Curated annotation (Swiss-Prot):
GO cellular component: cytoplasm
Swiss-Prot/TrEMBL cofactor(s): NH4(+); K(+)
Family classification: Belongs to the type III pantothenate kinase family.
Organism of origin: Ruminiclostridium cellulolyticum (strain ATCC 35319 / DSM 5812 / JCM 6584 / H10)
Protein's UniProt name: Type III pantothenate kinase
Length: 255
């Protein structure tokens, strides 16, 4: 079995593969205060809950955009799984030609998504990852990483509205029944939700225009993307495990 780990700013997502089959996946909060022992015991507990044997894990692959947690995570993996993890970074074989001014600036999560997206759907392709930040990645018909867009995620937008406007409350992220809100909370929810959907669709269309390619497919992934996909007019498909699949593929290309 292969354990893949995607470390994001808000969540750590883990998946276990047997060959190409995803046996289980879990989501933990990204807590920089956790010790390696706490993290290790959490991972052991997840395996036990699914009745999976941690001893059958032969490799661990990690992609991270949170450097401060990496020492703790690596130590937990070494101590509790007895494996030196493969960390996605410069020098890792991906099969993707990165056409960025400085390829080292591209986040590991974006590269992993590009690998999975092109393998599963082909190109041209736009991948929208709706996490703490929302990222848009453009992939050419030849599988080249062309670049993309980074903007605040929907949760950051909602939280900023609450923190910076004295009379506005904190809101739950839900799809409102109508655009026209009938009270403060529904008005805020409408602005945050429909404003975010509009942002996604507008940026996707601008990227398509600049790519100059026909039949560009748009794939969404990330925490809130299912709800956004249902409302979006540009997203073709929602894939909740895209990043995990990309980690598996990169592992296979490096063994």
């Amino acid at each position: 079995m292969v354990l893949v780990v995607d470390v994001g700013n808000t969540h750590i997502v883990l998946g276990v593969f047997e060959g190409k089959k995803l046996l289980a996946n879990w989501r933990l909060g990204t807590n920089k205060e956790r010790t390696s022992d706490e993290l290790g015991m959490l991972i052991l507990g997840l395996f036990n809950h699914e009745k999976l044997s941690i001893d059958k894990v032969k490799s661990v692959v990690v992609a991270s955009v949170v450097p401060p947690i990496m020492y703790t995570l690596e130590h937990a993996i070494k101590k509790y799984i007895n494996i030196q993890p493969m960390i996605i970074g410069p020098g890792t074989k991906t099969g993707i030609n990165i056409r960025y001014q400085n390829p080292k600036e591209v986040g590991a999560d974006r590269i992993v998504n590009a690998v999975a997206g092109f393998e599963l759907y082909g190109g041209p392709l736009i991948i929208v990852d709706m996490g703490t930040a929302t990222t848009f990645c453009a992939i050419s018909e030849k599988g080249e990483y062309l670049g993309g867009v980074i903007c605040p995620g929907i949760k950051i937008s909602a939280e900023a509205l609450y923190q910076k406007a004295a009379k506005l409350p904190r809101i739950d992220l839900v799809k409102p029944e109508s655009v026209i809100g009938k009270n403060t909370i529904s008005s805020m929810q409408s602005g945050v939700f429909f404003g975010y959907v509009g942002q996604v669709d507008y940026i996707v269309n601008r990227i398509k225009n600049e790519m100059h390619e026909e039949n560009v497919r748009v794939i969404a992934t990330g925490g809130i993307s299912r709800m956004i996909t249902e409302e979006s007019i540009t997203i073709n498909e929602f894939n909740p495990t895209l990043t995990l699949e990309g980690l598996r593929l990169i592992y296979e290309r490096n063994v």
